[in-house]
């Protein structure tokens, strides 16, 4: 379980960091290397989920989406300096609960 969580966190950070670098390049006129580094980071993000032990691609990506939401809220707060409100946190917690059900519910 800890490896799965670690891979989800690593994928999330790679996706958000890569997207953020591309954002800075295109929206805030940062140098081209921001965009290139962002693109490379996004490629790495695309590979990371393949190391998950779960057999279903769809389940892994759906569950990852919930983790991504939590990380995106945290990134916005810590890096972009946009304080999340109660509804941001409530929505993120609901998503995390859904992820837990999807991944670890007993199945027969």
Swiss-Prot record:
Q: Which UniProt keywords apply?
A: Cell membrane, Membrane, Transmembrane, Transmembrane helix
Any one annotated GO CC term: plasma membrane
Residues that span the membrane, as ranges:
3-23, 31-51, 60-80, 86-106
Q: How does it sit in the membrane?
A: Multi-pass membrane protein
The family database entries (Pfam families) matched by this protein are listed as: UPF0060
Q: Chief subcellular site?
A: membrane
Q: Which Gene3D superfamilies match?
A: 1.10.3730.20
**Family per similarity comment:** Belongs to the UPF0060 family.
InterPro entries, alphabetically? UPF0060 (IPR003844)
Which cellular compartments is it found in?
A: Cell membrane
According to UniProt, the name of this protein is UPF0060 membrane protein BLi00854/BL03049
